[in-house]
C-alpha cells in the first residue's frame, strides 16, 4: 500500500469527506476486534488520506461503546503514523462559540469504565507513556500552519474536558469543568488520545464547536438539529485544510 499521509477520524456530523477521490475501502480486523467501520483511503486534493467515522457511518455507536483500541490499532496496521481527530464539542469559554474551530493543547479526562490502554494482555509490555502534552506538538504545528496558509480561522489553544456521555452535561457539571480550567466539553477525546500515544502515533485534535455547553452563551436548550447544522457549516472549509495538513 502507498504511504498514507494522514488519517482523519470523523466525529458527530462528519461521516464522510467531500472531494475524496479514488477511494479504496478496507475492512480491518485487529487483535481488539473490529473498528467503528470501514476505513476509506483515497486522494484529497492530491494527498493520500485515510478516513473513518468514529461513531460508525450510521452514528450507531455512543461514545462509551466505541472500540477505541480497535480504531487506533486498525490505523496502525494500515501504516498510519499521523492522526487528525475531528471532535464535535460544546463551548464553555466565551471565546469558543458555535461554529468555532479549535486546536486544543490540553485535556482533562472525566470518563470512566472505558478500556483505556493496550497494556492489558498477559505478557504485554507495560508502558508509562509521557502524556503531559496529550496532543502531538509536531502535528499541532502542522495544523496551525496549514490554517494560516489557507486562511481558516482557528483558535490555537484550549483545554478539552472529556465526559462520559451519551447524555449532555448539567449546568452544575459545566460549572465544575469551567473551574477546572476546561474551555470545551465533549465525549470522545479519551481514551483515543492516550491510545494513540501508546502506539507512538502523532495525534492532534481539531475541535468543531457545535453549541454552547449547558448554561453557557444564551443558555438555550441544546438540540441535535442545532449541533448538526453548526457542524455542517463549520466543516465546509475543512477538506482543503485537511489536505494542507497532509501535505506538511
From Swiss-Prot:
Highest taxon of the lineage: Bacteria
Gene Ontology biological process terms in this record: L-methionine salvage from methylthioadenosine; purine ribonucleoside salvage
Pathway listed: Purine metabolism; purine nucleoside salvage
UniProt KW keywords: Glycosyltransferase, Purine salvage, Transferase
Recorded catalytic activity of this chain's protein: S-methyl-5'-thioinosine + phosphate = 5-(methylsulfanyl)-alpha-D-ribose 1-phosphate + hypoxanthine
Positions bearing the site annotation: Important for substrate specificity: 169, 224
A single GO cellular-component term on record: cytosol
Molecular functions per Gene Ontology: S-methyl-5-thioadenosine phosphorylase activity
Annotated residues for binding of phosphate: 12, 54-55, 188
Keyword Glycosyltransferase carried by entry: yes
InterPro entries cross-referenced by the UniProt entry: MTAP, Nucleoside_phosphorylase_d, Nucleoside_phosphorylase_sf, Purine_phosphorylase-2_CS
Enzyme class per UniProt: transferase
Entry EC no(s): 2.4.2.44
Residues that bind substrate: 187, 211-213
Family matches, as SUPFAM superfamilies: Purine and uridine phosphorylases
PANTHER family reported for this sequence: S-METHYL-5'-THIOADENOSINE PHOSPHORYLASE
Comment field (misc): Although this enzyme belongs to the family of MTA phosphorylases based on sequence homology, it has been shown that conserved amino acid substitutions in the substrate binding pocket convert the substrate specificity of this enzyme from 6-aminopurines to 6-oxopurines.
Function: Catalyzes the reversible phosphorylation of S-methyl-5'-thioinosine (MTI) to hypoxanthine and 5-methylthioribose-1-phosphate. Involved in the breakdown of S-methyl-5'-thioadenosine (MTA), a major by-product of polyamine biosynthesis. Catabolism of (MTA) occurs via deamination to MTI and phosphorolysis to hypoxanthine.
Record NCBIfam families: PRK09136.1 (NF006599)
Assembly description: Homotrimer.
Family: Belongs to the PNP/MTAP phosphorylase family. MTAP subfamily.
The protein, known as: Probable S-methyl-5'-thioinosine phosphorylase
Gene name, Swiss-Prot/TrEMBL: mtnP
Amino acid at each position: 500500500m502507498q504511504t498514507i499521509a494522514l488519517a482523519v477520524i470523523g466525529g458527530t456530523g462528519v461521516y464522510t469527506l467531500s472531494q475524496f477521490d479514488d477511494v479504496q475501502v478496507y475492512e480491518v480486523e485487529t487483535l481488539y476486534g473490529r473498528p467503528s467501520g470501514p476505513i476509506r483511503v483515497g486522494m484529497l486534493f492530491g494527498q493520500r488520506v485515510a478516513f473513518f467515522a468514529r461513531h460508525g457511518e450510521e452514528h450507531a455507536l455512543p461514545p462509551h461503546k466505541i472500540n477505541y483500541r480497535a480504531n487506533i490499532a486498525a490505523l496502525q496496521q494500515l501504516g498510519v503514523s499521523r492522526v487528525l481527530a475531528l471532535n464535535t464539542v460544546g463551548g464553555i469559554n466565551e471565546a469558543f462559540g458555535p461554529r468555532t474551530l479549535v486546536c486544543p493543547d490540553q485535556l482533562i479526562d472525566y470518563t470512566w469504565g472505558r478500556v483505556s490502554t493496550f497494556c492489558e494482555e498477559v505478557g504485554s509490555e507495560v508502558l508509562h507513556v509521557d502524556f503531559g502534552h496529550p496532543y502531538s506538538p509536531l502535528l499541532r504545528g502542522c495544523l496551525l500552519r496549514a490554517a494560516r496558509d489557507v486562511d481558516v480561522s482557528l483558535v490555537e489553544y484550549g483545554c478539552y474536558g472529556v465526559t462520559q456521555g451519551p447524555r449532555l452535561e448539567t449546568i452544575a457539571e459545566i460549572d465544575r469543568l469551567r473551574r477546572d480550567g476546561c474551555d470545551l466539553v465533549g465525549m470522545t477525546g479519551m481514551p483515543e488520545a492516550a491510545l494513540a500515544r501508546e502506539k507512538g502515533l502523532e495525534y492532534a485534535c481539531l475541535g468543531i464547536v457545535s453549541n454552547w455547553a449547558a448554561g453557557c452563551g444564551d443558555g438555550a436548550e441544546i438540540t441535535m438539529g442545532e449541533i448538526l447544522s453548526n457542524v455542517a457549516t463549520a466543516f465546509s472549509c475543512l477538506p482543503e485544510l485537511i489536505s494542507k495538513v497532509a501535505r506538511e
